Amino acid sequence: LQVEHPVTEEVTGLDLVREQILIAQGMPLSVSQEDLSINGHAMEVRIYGEDPANDFLPTAGPVLLFERSKVADARYDTGIETGSNVGIEFDPMLAKIIVHAPTRTEASLRLARVLETTRIQGLITNRDFLVSVLREQAFLDGDTTTDYIERINPPRSRAVDRGQIIEGAIAAAMAAQYDRRLASNTLKRIRSGWRNSIMPPEHVEYTCGEEEVTIDYQSQRDGSFNVMADDLTLKVELVERDGNTIDMTVDGRRVAYTVTSNEDRWLTHGPSG
């Protein structure tokens, strides 16, 4: 089979692996050339354990979280799951992700959104780089050659603004607070954050890339938190902590983050990736 046979399968509706097995059993192909037709466009990307910002150097380590996107239909060909470990003995490809759409542009933009909402935490991957490529105008225009990366030089990582960093840090702080409360052996039936008296603010510091963020938060009698970051004071309410997901409102705006931790590292994945 060709390496990218899923693309052919998506546009023809033919199961090439099945056909290969039938041939190996001495049976003929189940279709003729005249039976085949091309329907729309399919596109595939490969998620690798590699660091695009460091000359695509392979990366290894535990997969703390792997969750497929739910925003659109997509095919995942992968052998990893949450808890897998990516070693150095083999090629660091983690998954192939394939989408189908009526046009090439629709397929590209759909795949970018699927990638953006695919949650992979624990090791550096090329996911954000692939999203950049798929949304690059030159790529959408079909200006793709073997020197595309050197010639167009798409961003190697996703740009994250200060507000997104702060919100991700708040999600990590709220998740940590909830997990500590859950692990407590006293008054477990009382909801997280509730106090019969106002407690002093809690203080936590995070580093995201080259940026540092300081979060101070104080529980209120109604179970909400006053959160201070930079010159902002925000009201945060914890809606739910379900597995790795934390659902909260920030000044009345509801957002959900996936939050995992590994020793002193906190990994967050929010609405924008």
What do these predicted regions represent?
Residues Q2-L232:
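Catalytic cores of soluble metabolic enzymes centered on carboxylation/carboxyl-transfer
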Residues M27-P28, R241, D251:
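Short Pro/Gly-enriched beta-strand edge/turn motifs at strand-loop
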Residues E44, N54, V250-G273:
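Structured, non-catalytic alpha/beta "coupling" segments that mediate domain-domain communication
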Residues V213-I215, L232-E237, R254-Y257:
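A structural detector for short beta-strand units
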Residues S219-Q220, E240-R241, T260-N262:
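Generic beta-strand structural signal
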Residues G223-F225, V236-I246:
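Glycine-rich, small/acidic residue-mixed loop/short-helix segments
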Residues F225-V227, M248, T268:
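Well-ordered beta-strand segments characteristic of repetitive beta-sheet solenoids
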